[in-house]
């Protein structure tokens, strides 16, 4: 039988490694020191903490009860499995956690991340930290204890003569720390969540692909979505249409962050440069009041479409190589064409290029021209991580998006980059 620490060993928080970020999510920055002081003054129980919140603040019982409900809802919503450890848990194992949550609360969180119901749960305020638990007969029933805390999960059990394994991968990476240092703790938390949810065996191609998307594409998509939202707030379009194929992941992240309706514009360089009658009819139906959002480009195809048809589209690129004409600006001007190519490749879709649309506006596609395996891994990692983002990033600038795009260029699989076709670069 193995005993397991729970927080940051089996379950992660979307808000990040520091649990007080949940307090900020619930009540704002000013609430954090109140909540922390209440915990210090309390009897170290969940109910006792909120009794102290009311004592400190003088707030009404109804207001404090709402904060309590909101904090628990945030904990549940932000819980994710640390995959490489959860897959090791067996039905007869035991969870031992120093926490202010009750055993029933930890059970609810454990259920959410897929822990078997037959796993026993033991909770206390500091029995592991103080060493009291490790002196018990129950602790000696375990062949091994696994946890992330240097003292509680490593030093204390070993001092009691028990086998222990310290889990260190839950600590933030240097990239995650850099985003948090720049004020984007919600981005760092989402990237960390994606990284720790990696379901693939270490050393496999799938693990590498997932890891790259978690580290680089999750921050890029979150920051890009925030920049698009700011632009759209100023432009005030009736709707946003994200351009197929490379912007489909961005559309999903945008919707997850802002809960605003989005649509997909099924188009390609081919359809814009040589539009059929059906494609023209499709564009005319879609264009009024629509802002078209493309992930990366030079604007050549859009300008050629306007020249040939006289139809001017309200078009914006997230990333470009230079300042474009007023009808097709780029929100972030990249420092090199290779970075833009990498962004496209990391955000490939697993359906073929649009060659035309039918009379109903349904896409007609060419066969898929690249390996779908890494594409599908990138998609799942990117969406799973981005959906766990606690709140939309704030204060995003073009430079932040450029920095994130440059990280994508370093992380994109070289085997997929080699498959990038010439027609994708126009």
Positions of PLM-derived features:
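Conserved Lys-Pro-Asp/Glu-containing loop-to-beta segment of HAD-superfamily phosphomonoesterases
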Residues: 130-153, 288-293
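A metal-dependent, Asp-based hydrolase signature
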Residues: 23-71
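Substrate-recognition element of Asp-dependent hydrolases with the DxDx(T/V) motif
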Residues: 60-111, 120-124, 239-246
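Structural motif
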Residues: 6-7, 99, 147-148, 243-246, ...
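Active-site neighborhood of HAD-like aspartate-dependent phosphohydrolases
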Residues: 1-36
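Long, charge-dense
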Residues: 257-282
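Long, contiguous domain-sized segments
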Residues: 214-217, 273-426
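Acidic, Mg2+-coordinating phosphoryl-transfer loop and its flanking beta/alpha structural elements
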Residues: 146, 151-179, 313-314
